[in-house]
UniProtKB/Swiss-Prot annotation:
Protein name stated in the entry: Delta(1)-pyrroline-2-carboxylate reductase
GO molecular function: oxidoreductase activity
Positions that bind substrate: R52, T160, R186, G187
Superkingdom per UniProt: Bacteria
Catalytic reactions on record: L-proline + NAD(+) = 1-pyrroline-2-carboxylate + NADH + H(+); L-proline + NADP(+) = 1-pyrroline-2-carboxylate + NADPH + H(+)
Assembly, per entry: Homodimer.
Keyword NADP appears in the UniProt entry: yes
Length: 336
C-alpha cells in the first residue's frame, strides 16, 4: 500500500471546503481558506497545504475564532485602508479589501491595507501574487506567536514573522519571495515532529537553550532567526510595522492572548501596494526593462530566481494532481 494518495486540485479544494463548513465556517470564509490551502498544496508548500486544516479546525473548536465574522472596512486616508476581521480568519478580510487597496494604489501611487483582529495561518505569497495580478508591486508582513528567540538570546520574543514581495512581470510569472524571518516556518518543524524526522541543528534550540535536532524538543524550546542578527533585526521591524504601528498585537501579546490554548495566532497584518505606472510615468516601460535586465543577470549565471521551484511544482500539480501522505489524509477525512 502506497504511503501517498493522489488527489486532483479540485478534490483538494472540495475536501477542504467540506471540512471547513462541517465545523461551522461560513461559505465565504470556507471558500477563501480552501482556495489558499489548495494553492499551498499545489505549489508543494506542504507546511501551508492541507496540513493546515487540522489547525483551522482545532482553533475553531477552542472557541477563539468567530467562524462567521464579516470583515468591515474603514477608509483611514486616501492611501490607507483598515480592515477589521472581527476575530475571524484573515483571508476573507484580505480578499474583501484587495480591490480597494488596488484602487488606492492607482490613485496615490502607494497604498497600505491594515488587517486587524484577525487569526492568520497562511502563506503570504498568494496575497502578494494577487496584488501582482493587478499590475502592482506588493509587500505583506505579519507577526505570529512568540516562538523565536532573538539572536544571542534563549527566550522566545519574536514570531516567525514572514515577509513577502511580488513584482509583476509582463507575460510571465511574477518575481516573488515569501520567507519567515525565523530559520524555517513553524509548520515545517511541526511536520518533522509528526513524521518523527530530525531537523537541522540551526533551526531551533531546546528548552535549555541548546541546539537540537529533535523536532519535538524544538517545539518546546525556541526557534532561531535566519542570518543571526540580520534576521533578528528584520523580525523586530515586522513586530513594529505590523504590530505596534497598526495598533495590533505583537507576537508576545498574541501568545498571551492565546492563553495556552494553542490556537492559530491572532494579530494584525500590513499589506502594501505600489503602482509602477504612477512612480514611473512615461518611463514605465523602461522601468520594467530595467527589472527584466536584473532578473536576466541573475538567471544567466545559473542562479535560480525565488519561487521558480514553486512555479515548477505548480505546473506538475496542474497536470498530475498532488500527493498527500495517507495518514494525514485519513486524519483530515476524520474531521468530516
Amino acid at each position: 500500500m502506497s504511503e501517498y494518495i493522489t488527489l486532483s486540485l479540485d478534490e483538494v479544494c472540495a475536501l477542504s471546503y467540506q471540512v471547513l463548513t462541517r465545523h461551522g465556517l461560513s461559505d465565504a470564509h470556507a471558500r477563501a481558506i480552501a482556495e489558499v490551502i489548495t494553492q499551498g498544496q499545489r505549489d508543494e508548500c506542504h507546511s501551508h497545504g492541507v496540513y493546515r486544516l487540522l489547525g483551522c479546525v482545532r482553533s475553531v473548536r477552542e472557541g477563539r475564532i468567530d467562524p462567521r465574522a464579516e470583515p468591515s472596512l474603514r477608509h483611514v486616508s486616501p492611501g490607507v485602508l483598515e480592515v477589521d476581521a472581527h476575530y475571524g480568519y484573515s483571508l476573507l478580510g484580505f480578499h474583501t479589501g484587495l480591490p480597494i487597496l488596488a484602487e488606492k494604489a492607482r490613485s496615490q501611487g502607494i497604498a497600505a491595507m491594515v488587517i486587524k483582529r484577525c487569526f492568520h495561518f497562511s502563506a503570504l505569497w498568494p496575497e502578494v501574487e494577487a496584488i501582482a495580478d493587478y499590475g502592482l508591486v506588493g509587500m505583506a508582513m505579519n507577526p505570529s506567536h512568540s516562538w523565536v528567540a532573538p539572536a544571542g538570546g534563549r527566550q522566545p520574543v519574536f514570531g516567525t514573522n514572514p515577509l513577502a514581495f511580488a513584482w509583476p512581470r509582463p507575460g510571465g510569472q511574477p518575481f516573488v519571495f515569501d520567507f519567515a524571518t525565523s530559520a524555517i516556518a513553524r509548520g515545517d518543524i511541526e511536520l518533522h515532529a509528526r513524521q518523527g524526522k530530525p531537523i537541522p541543528e540551526h533551526w531551533a534550540i531546546d528548552a535549555d537553550g541548546q541546539p537540537t535536532t529533535d523536532a519535538k524538543a524544538a517545539l518546546q524550546g525556541a526557534m532561531q532567526t535566519f542570518g543571526g542578527h540580520k534576521g533578528s533585526a528584520l523580525a523586530a521591524m515586522i513586530e513594529l510595522l505590523a504590530g505596534a504601528l497598526i495598533g495590533d498585537l505583537t507576537s508576545a501579546e498574541s501568545m498571551a492572548f492565546d492563553g495556552g490554548v494553542g490556537a492559530t495566532p491572532c494579530h494584525g497584518e500590513l499589506v502594501l501596494a505600489f503602482d509602477p505606472r504612477v512612480f514611473l510615468g512615461e518611463g514605465y516601460e523602461q522601468g520594467l526593462e530595467r527589472a527584466e535586465g536584473l532578473f536576466a543577470a541573475i538567471a544567466r549565471q545559473g542562479a535560480r530566481l525565488p519561487s521558480q521551484r514553486r512555479f515548477a511544482a505548480r505546473a506538475r500539480s496542474l497536470e498530475h494532481g498532488v500527493q498527500i501522505p495517507r495518514g494525514l489524509l485519513e486524519d483530515i477525512r476524520g474531521l468530516l
